[in-house]
Each structure stands twice: as structure tokens, then as C-alpha cells.
Amino acid sequence: MTAIAPVITIDGPSGAGKGTLCKAMAEALQWHLLDSGAIYRVLALAALHHHVDLASEDALVPLASHLDVRFVSTDGNLEVILEGEDVSGEIRTQEVANAASQVAAFPRVREALLRRQRAFREAPGLIADGRDMGTVVFPDAPVKIFLDASSEERAHRRMLQLQENGFSVNFERLLAEIKERDDRDRHRAVAPLVPAADALVLDSTRLSIEQVIEKALQYARQKLALA
């Protein structure tokens, strides 16, 4: 019987550093990577490319079931490959964001994408980045990490990121938005943002990203008995 490929799930709120951690771990272990937060945008873009009706659940389900997407991390940069093309920039447009909200509203589309995400589980292993990876998508994952940070620290990181890109931002407004999103995510009826019972909760508030990566890799290697 073929052994099931191991999965390391990295869940947590926006701004905790999940993306950076997942890319670093995928490169360090040479494992596959799943960015679940991008997958609805990728489906929306595929629908736009193929002129699929965004209001038709029946048309979207087969597209979601056979979505040709992969995520590649190289030197800390994540490439989103749809049907052989790098669409990392294209999925960040407002048109795609709006379309993603439409397709995510359909229950059968969500179910199809759940199965598609689980199909990323291939040897030698998978790093899964999201909000419900350890609780819903891969509840049997041998390594689960919930990466957290204070809302103030996450707002500060987001502010610096926006300022580096030339945007003027108000810290208090940013903090209020993050707190509102946290409250909504943690109290929603379906797949609330909570650590899995068997997850390591890693608070990155006072840690550098290098320290977070070191702690996460050490924990994963210990749990999986990796060299």
C-alpha cells in the first residue's frame, strides 16, 4: 500500500506571516506548495479566460474540479501557474477579485475546490497555506501550525508593506479593519478561524521571520523525523 504524502498545514489570520513561512518551508524541504487563499482567484481567472458564465454554478463546477494550477516558490517569490502560464500578477486585479467573490458563493464550487485542494497532496509532501487547512481541508495532517500575531503587530506590518509600495495609510483605520476581519473570521458559522486542537500555536509578534522559520522547521522535522 502506498504511503500517503505528509502535509504541513499553516493556518492563521491575515498578516501573521503565513505566506513567507510557507514559501521558506517549501523551499527548505523541497515540497509542493498550496496557497489556498489564491485558489478562488485562480478559478475566477480561468472562468474569465474560458468565457464561463460566472453566474452558472453548473458551468463552474467542472472547471473547478479540473483546475490546472500549481504554486512554485523560487528564492522566496511565489509564482501562480495557471494552464502553464504565470498569472501571479493577473489574479491580483480588481476584476478577478470581484469574480472570485461571485464564484465562492456557490456551495458545489466550494466542494469541488475542496477536492481539488486535497489533490495537491503528493510526494514528497505538501505545505498548505490557509485559514482552515488543519481543521477542514487536511484534518489528518501530521504537522499543523497556527501562526498568529497581535492585531497591532499585523497592522504595523501591513502599514509598512503599503508604505513601501507608495501608499499613504492610516494606522488606526488599518487596525480597525484587521480587528473587524478577525472577528468575522473567528465567529463565522462555516470553518471559523481557530487553531486545530493538535496544532502548534506560534505567536510571531516578537519574533523575526527568520526565528519563525527556524522554529517551524524544527517542529516539523521533529514531528516527521526528518533529517
UniProtKB/Swiss-Prot annotation:
This is Cytidylate kinase. It holds the Pfam family Cytidylate_kin. InterPro entries: Cytidylate_kin, Cytidylate_kinase_dom, P-loop_NTPase. ATP binds at G12, P13, S14, G15, A16, G17, K18, G19, T20. Its EC number is 2.7.4.25. It is found in: Cytoplasm. Its main location: cytoplasm. It is an enzyme of class 2 (transferase). Belongs to the cytidylate kinase family. Type 1 subfamily. GO terms for molecular function: (d)CMP kinase activity; ATP binding; CMP kinase activity; dCMP kinase activity. Keywords: ATP-binding, Cytoplasm, Kinase, Nucleotide-binding, Transferase. It catalyses: CMP + ATP = CDP + ADP; dCMP + ATP = dCDP + ADP. PANTHER family: CYTIDYLATE KINASE (PTHR21299:SF2), CYTIDYLATE KINASE/PANTOATE-BETA-ALANINE LIGASE (PTHR21299). GO terms for biological process: nucleobase-containing small molecule interconversion; pyrimidine nucleotide metabolic process. GO terms for cellular component: cytosol.
